[in-house]
């Protein structure tokens, strides 16, 4: 009985660890805050926000 309880708890611990790895490696969607481009799903971090394409407000900002 002790062996079965130990193996079940180890199995559950592995599942929890795998879920944590998946959650920490998930990319961020457009509109989410970011610090680096690799954190965003489209690999585009503009002024601490995931945006694709990068839109720079200014004189000639004509992206549509």
Swiss-Prot record:
Propeptide: 61-64
Keyword Disulfide bond: yes
Domain of life: Eukaryota
A Pfam family the protein falls into: Conotoxin_I2
Protein name: Conotoxin Im11.2
Subcellular location: Secreted
Entry annotated with the keyword Nucleotidyltransferase: no
Tissue expression as described in the entry: Expressed by the venom duct.
Record-level Gene Ontology MF annotations: toxin activity
Cystine pairs: 27-41, 34-46, 40-50, 45-54
GO cellular component terms listed in the entry, alphabetical order: extracellular region
Aspartic acid 1-amide, modified sites: 57
Organism listed in the record: Conus imperialis (Imperial cone)
Signal peptide: 1-26
Keywords recorded for this protein, A-Z: Amidation, Cleavage on pair of basic residues, Disulfide bond, Secreted, Signal, Toxin
Domain notes: The cysteine framework is XI (C-C-CC-CC-C-C).
InterPro entries named among the record's database cross-references: Conotoxin-I_CS, Conotoxin_I2
Family: Belongs to the conotoxin I2 superfamily.
């Amino acid at each position: 009985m002790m062996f079965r309880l130990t193996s079940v708890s180890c199995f559950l611990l592995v599942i929890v660890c795998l879920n944590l790895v998946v959650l920490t490696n998930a990319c961020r969607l457009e509109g989410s805050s970011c610090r680096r481009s690799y954190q965003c799903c489209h690999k585009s971090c503009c002024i601490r926000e995931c945006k694709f394409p990068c839109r720079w407000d200014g004189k000639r900002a004509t992206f549509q």
